[in-house]
Amino acid sequence: MTFETSARLILLASLGTLLAACSSIQDTASTLNPFTIIEEDDPNAPPVDERVSILSFEQSLQADPEAAALPVELPTAYRNTIWAQPDGYPTHAMQHTQASGPLDILFRRNFGNGSNRSSRINSRPIYADGRIYAMDGRGYVFALDPENGSEIWEVALREPNRNDRTSFGGGLAFDGGRVFVHNGHRFLAALDAATGQEIWRAESLTPFHSAPTAVGGMVYASTDDNELYAIDQSNGEIVWNHQGIAEPARLLTSPSVAVLGETVVAPYASGELVALRSQNGNPIWNDALTRSGGLTPISAINDVAGSPVIVDDMVYAMSHSGILAAFNLRTGERIWTQPAGGLHAPWVAGNFLFLVTS
């Protein structure tokens, strides 16, 4: 046998072994492949009624048949004379406010600029001290007469960096004869409510985002990178700050912290809900209103886009990703949870909670 013939035989034997090995690997891989197509008449195919869609595991808010006959009873309506914070009171619990119908438009007035590609109106008007205070898309603050909408004063809050003109977020709050405002830039200002004159300005490293809450001699507002500032109302000094988990994906809303006594409850874009001591910012408890398994990219955003609400010893909060929960204010114990998500603060009236889901 020549060397050439021996080489050919060795090559053929090697190819045969290799093909056999490939066939074996292919057979093994086929048994492990979860996406292998199974014919309908395959005896090993599971019955059709045993196939469960993964969508069936998605939880959603369902009506309880046992509660269908429960009467919805609201507390006695009262006449509210002030709306000094973005969500009414510092606790955000407005209960059952009185209004005699039918409601008619008292006046209609255009003022300032609207939203555009570089700025957006996220701030809500407030009412205090017999005046309406509002902000336009440029960050101008207006004081208006509630009887006819006539302008009392107008103030332009200028960003020191002229190149930084883009702003999203903002809000106003009133306390002690002052209007506390930010327009989505790197500062929060205190204005004299009577004249609009700027009293002081507190600066931050990143733009403010959440609407301010002003109560108890302090102003609370958080920034785009989830850092909460507590600022002295009298002089604008930063008393303390709390850094939440940074989260770049958030919604264009302006929630505000809820405050009751010495407890501050802060919502963050990461889905965190943190209770802090108003004196020093020390954490009392925290929880995460996060939910995985969203079917779309936007459903995975965990932002607590609406303000939390404090009623007595309970806290109610809802994240965009689909968690509505009630907590004990003192301990942070989660009392109950429902699969509901939205952009707005829940409204509590008596023993009932009203909300709009997304």
Describe the residue ranges of each PLM region:
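Bacterial signal peptide processing site
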Residues: 23-26
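Short loop/turn segments that connect beta-strands within beta-propeller blades
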Residues: 145-148, 192-196, 232-236, 278-281, ...
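Structural signature of WD-repeat beta-propellers
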Residues: 136-137, 167, 176, 183-184, ...
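C-terminal motif of bacterial Sec signal peptides marking the signal peptidase cleavage site
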Residues: 18-21
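Extracytoplasmic beta-rich repeat domains
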Residues: 106-126, 154-173, 200-215, 238-260, ...
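Blade/loop signatures of beta-propeller domains
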Residues: 44-63, 69-106
